[in-house]
């Protein structure tokens, strides 16, 4: 069996690569200015990528599990990198349609496959701490904008939009390939009551299969709370940079730095909240998310204070990241 901490490092490597999608807001204004696209046209690219992330993760999850983490990781790399190179081409000819196709659809499929691959693998190495393992696996996805935000802002300023995507594509090709080649599922063990988590025991004792679970009211409830939590965070992530520039008069460089800080809280929220949920409970943790977000969004709409505005954004993002980590656990 491979070292589980190196497996965790490989998982983080995959997620840091695809998680750069969270820094999209840094590119919003440059794309609008250089390409002549509207704000809604530009942000729809991000929305489409996130939509495809969810769809591909949902419909290709069993396929990724079947072919194994190494092959599914490499497949995610091919889609994501192809999406980035295609985006560079789309921007070079000022094509909004191709931008949607390459970044939104093709890149989005890579996001979905790349998202579930390390999560399902790493949880198997930490059978008694599923919340911690999930948070550890997707921590890189949240932290990615810490690196990608300032990096994209620098690349766009010095080499232009098109070359920015080419450089990112080459970088992620290397990182994702190396990470995928190390990923390997652990050797299966015969489950015992001492090494089974409660959810696994329930499946064995009650015979609850995926198709059966989807027919229950609990599944519908989980889907809706997950949807609401994602919507709260995505709305901020897609507009974080231009929103802070307009609302509290941040410079583009400062806004890019804030996007990086958002990455810290996004990633930190994933590992912190998921670990807390191992002891506090998943349902109770989600209730706390909603209480925090309701209060934070209300105050956010009323405040004109720059510090308060930024603190509230970061608080909401921790809940957003934590929701992603708690749900798979």
PLM segments and residue spans:
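Hydrophobic core of transmembrane alpha-helices in multi-pass small-molecule transporters
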Residues: 15-16, 83, 96-113, 227, ...
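Residue-level signature of mid-helix packing/kink "hotspots" within the transmembrane helices
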Residues: 22, 50-58, 146, 263-271, ...
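Extracytoplasmic gate region of multi-pass secondary transporters
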Residues: 24-29, 211-275, 328
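Intracellular juxtamembrane helix-capping segments at the cytosolic ends
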Residues: 31, 112-126, 133-134, 322-329
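Helix-to-loop junctions at the C-terminal end of transmembrane segments
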Residues: 56-69, 270-281
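C-terminal ends and interior cores of transmembrane alpha-helices
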Residues: 78-93, 292-304
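Helix-loop-helix hairpin linking two adjacent transmembrane segments in secondary transporters
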Residues: 141-188
């Amino acid at each position: 069996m491979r070292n589980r901490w190196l497996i965790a490092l490989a998982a983080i490597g995959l997620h840091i690569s695809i998680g750069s999608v969270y820094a999209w807001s840094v590119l919003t204004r440059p794309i609008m200015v250089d390409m002549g696209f509207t704000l809604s046209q530009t942000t729809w690219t991000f929305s489409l990528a996130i939509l495809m992330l969810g769809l591909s993760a949902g419909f290709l999850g069993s396929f990724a599990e079947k072919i194994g983490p190494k092959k599914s990781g490499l497949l995610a790399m091919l889609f994501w990198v192809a999406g980035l190179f295609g985006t560079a081409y789309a921007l070079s000819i000022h094509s909004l349609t191709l931008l949607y196709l390459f970044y939104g659809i093709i890149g989005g499929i890579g996001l979905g496959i790349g998202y579930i691959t390390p999560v399902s693998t790493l949880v198997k190495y930490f059978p008694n701490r599923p919340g911690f393992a999930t948070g550890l696996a997707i921590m890189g996805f949240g932290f990615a904008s810490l690196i990608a935000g300032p990096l994209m802002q620098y690349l766009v300023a010095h080499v232009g939009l098109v070359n920015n995507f080419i450089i990112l594509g080459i970088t992620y090709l290397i990182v994702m390939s190396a990470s995928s080649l190390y990923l390997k599922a652990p050797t299966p063990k015969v489950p015992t009551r001492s090494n089974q988590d409660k959810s696994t025991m329930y499946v064995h004792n009650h015979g609850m299969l995926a198709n059966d679970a989807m027919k229950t009211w609990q599944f519908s409830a989980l889907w809706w709370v997950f949807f609401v939590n994602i919507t709260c965070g995505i709305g901020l992530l897609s507009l974080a940079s231009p929103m802070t520039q307009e609302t509290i008069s941040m410079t583009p460089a400062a806004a890019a730095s804030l996007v990086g800080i958002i990455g810290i809280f996004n990633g930190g929220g994933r590992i912190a909240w998921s670990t807390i949920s191992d002891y506090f409970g998943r349902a109770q943790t989600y209730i706390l998310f909603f209480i925090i977000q309701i209060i934070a969004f209300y105050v956010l709409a009323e405040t004109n204070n720059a510090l308060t505005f930024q603190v509230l954004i970061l608080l909401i993002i921790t809940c957003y990241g934590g929701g992603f980590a708690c749900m798979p656990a």
